Curated annotation (Swiss-Prot):
<dbReference type="GO" id="GO:0005886">
    <property type="term" value="C:plasma membrane"/>
</dbReference>
<keyword id="KW-1278">Translocase</keyword>
<dbReference type="GO" id="GO:0045259">
    <property type="term" value="C:proton-transporting ATP synthase complex"/>
</dbReference>
<keyword id="KW-0066">ATP synthesis</keyword>
<keyword id="KW-0067">ATP-binding</keyword>
<keyword id="KW-1003">Cell membrane</keyword>
<feature type="binding site">
    <location>
        <begin position="169"/>
        <end position="176"/>
    </location>
    <ligand>
        <name>ATP</name>
    </ligand>
</feature>
<dbReference type="GO" id="GO:0043531">
    <property type="term" value="F:ADP binding"/>
</dbReference>
<dbReference type="GO" id="GO:0046933">
    <property type="term" value="F:proton-transporting ATP synthase activity, rotational mechanism"/>
</dbReference>
<comment type="similarity">
    <text>Belongs to the ATPase alpha/beta chains family.</text>
</comment>
<dbReference type="Pfam" id="PF00006">
    <property type="entry name" value="ATP-synt_ab"/>
</dbReference>
<dbReference type="InterPro" id="IPR038376">
    <property type="entry name" value="ATP_synth_asu_C_sf"/>
</dbReference>
<protein>
    <recommendedName>
        <fullName>ATP synthase subunit alpha</fullName>
        <ecNumber>7.1.2.2</ecNumber>
    </recommendedName>
</protein>
<comment type="function">
    <text>Produces ATP from ADP in the presence of a proton gradient across the membrane. The alpha chain is a regulatory subunit.</text>
</comment>
<dbReference type="InterPro" id="IPR036121">
    <property type="entry name" value="ATPase_F1/V1/A1_a/bsu_N_sf"/>
</dbReference>
<keyword id="KW-0472">Membrane</keyword>
<dbReference type="InterPro" id="IPR000194">
    <property type="entry name" value="ATPase_F1/V1/A1_a/bsu_nucl-bd"/>
</dbReference>
């Protein structure tokens, strides 16, 4: 075999020339202790707050506590596989999530991984989950309605696109039912091609039973509403860090629509459980406890999340993100720590009561305690015209009803007021999964406030409403179309409506 020295030296020179000095550097630390979903890690000197780190078995975590001698990491997953002495690697990335229209119709976990068995997610890009809310200049005041399809809410406690409206009440009072009806009510809007009209829905379930979430998804699927919705689920069996991060992940997904000139609504169900998960994490990280053992920054936890809901100005695309946070109270106590915090952050609240629920008033909205601080400027002219009257009459009715319990001899005007009030209360009841369009609500409330329900027995109000609506949808559809297109109840349309209602009232009696 002939070995040529020149060839060998050429190969060696070539190898030396291409020899790189770069070494693969990855910063690693070591697990000091682990338990209850928290790991103490030594090393990782340059880790950032909120950075994603990776354990030996592939489980991920987030660096939350940066102390002098160790880093407190919350673990996004089971901590059973993680042992003392194992290595932890920096990823050099702050926690992010996939965003885009590819997520519509999907169910994902708190980090944006699919959990519905429909294959990988086609995301447009990834965005950080905890970002700064829009400043003052990009914002615009709320001006467009966000219809829920529920008469009691759209007429009396209107919500606008870009608003934050709290839904608060005890357990089993129908809080999630209101959220579900709101999602279902967006179906006709999402069937239209115009992106300005569409309203995408993001629902985040925190600390709920898996069966409840599965049932929710099933209803959306059956009603054809899943195709414009994203479900983010961090159920009761998920670790506290997952329940803490889920609302932020979902908010980022909603922000994609807001920042691209589209509209979205996000429902946090519910933030009480997120606060409990955050309290658990904070106590395990040895942060000092405050009132009700919550950490001192639990207000900031919710304020920085809810401030991300906004209506953007024309220069920034005119998009919006509406937030409907849900809070569960204990025995109607709205003066507890978390409820008062969230009430002060939001632009109004829908207050649900157990007593009303059991009286059969569903949705069980307490109209006296519920307010919408900015929604009235977003209400359509037609709704404003008929709703102003019903508000005053119901307020008088509640006042009189309290006194009427004590005295039996009531004068005629008081009796008339009580009759009208009980029929209007009956009119505001609505079965689940039957949202009404704005123009239909205007017509039935107009009939109620103009005295057409007064001669009827209370138990006939529902039948009257159903009959009137089917008559309007059938032969008199031009009245509904006129209200829908003009968003106003003109004198001409009101006269037509009057003749239809009068004719129907005579035949109904």
């Amino acid at each position: 075999m002939d070995i040529r020295a020149a060839e060998i030296s050429a190969i060696l020179k070539d190898q030396i020339k291409n020899f790189g000095q770069e070494a693969e550097v990855s910063e690693v630390g070591q697990v000091l202790s682990v338990g209850d979903g928290i790991a103490r890690v030594y090393g990782l000197d340059n880790v950032q707050a909120g950075e994603m780190v990776e354990f030996e078995n592939g489980t991920r975590g987030m660096a939350l506590n940066l102390e002098t001698d160790n880093v407190g990491v919350v673990i996004f997953g089971a901590d059973r596989e993680i042992k003392e002495g194992q290595t932890v690697k920096r990823t050099r990335a702050i926690v992010d999530a996939p965003v885009g229209k590819g997520l519509l119709g999907r169910v994902v976990d708190a980090l944006g991984n699919p959990i519905d068995g429909k294959g990988p997610i086609q995301a447009d890009k990834r965005m950080r989950v905890d970002v700064k809310a829009p400043g003052i200049i990009p914002r615009k005041s709320v001006s467009e309605p966000m219809a829920t399809g529920l008469k009691a809410i759209d007429a009396l406690i209107p919500i606008g696109r870009g608003q934050r409206e709290l839904i608060i009440g005890d357990r089993q009072t129908g809080k999630t039912a209101i959220a579900l009806d709101t999602i279902l009510n967006q179906k006709p809007l999402n069937a239209q091609p115009d992106e300005n009209i569409k309203l995408y829905c993001v629902y985040v379930a925190v600390g709920q039973k898996r069966s409840t979430v599965a049932q929710f998804v099933k209803v959306l699927e059956e009603q054809g509403a899943l195709e414009y919705s994203i479900i983010v689920a961090a159920t009761a069996s998920d670790p506290a860090p997952m329940q803490y991060i889920a609302p932020f992940t979902a908010c980022t997904m909603g922000e994609f629509f807001r920042d691209n000139g589209m509209h979205a609504v996000i429902i946090y169900d519910d933030l009480s459980k997120q606060a409990v998960a955050y309290r658990q994490m904070s106590l395990l990280l040895r942060r000092p406890p405050g009132r009700e053992a919550y950490p001192g920054d639990v207000f900031y936890l919710h304020s920085r999340l809810l401030e991300r809901a906004a209506k953007l100005s024309k220069d920034h695309g005119s998009g919006s993100l509406t937030a409907l946070p849900i809070i569960e109270t204990q025995a109607n106590d709205v003066s507890a720590y978390i409820p008062t915090n969230v009430i002060s952050i939001t632009d109004g609240q829908i207050f649900l009561e157990t007593d009303l629920f059991f009286q059969g008033i569903r949705p069980a909205v307490n109209v006296g305690l519920s307010v919408s601080r900015v929604g009235s400027s977003a209400q359509t002219k037609a709704t404003k015209k008929v709703a102003g009257k019903i508000k005053g009459e119901l307020a008088q009715y509640r006042e009189m009803a309290a006194f009427a319990q004590f005295g039996s001899d009531l004068d005629a005007s008081t009796q008339r007021l009580l009759n009208r009030g009980s029929r209007l209360t009956e009119l505001l009841k609505q079965p689940q999964f039957s949202p009404l369009k704005m123009e239909e609500q205007v017509c039935v409330i107009w009939a109620g406030t103009n005295g057409y329900l007064d001669p009827l027995p209370v138990n006939k109000v529902r039948a009257f409403e159903d009959g009137l609506l089917s008559l309007l949808r059938g032969k008199n559809v031009e009245i509904l179309n006129s209200i829908r297109d003009s968003r106003d109840l003109s004198d001409d349309t009101a006269a037509k409506l009057k003749s239809v209602v009068e004719g129907f009232a005579k035949s109904f009696a």
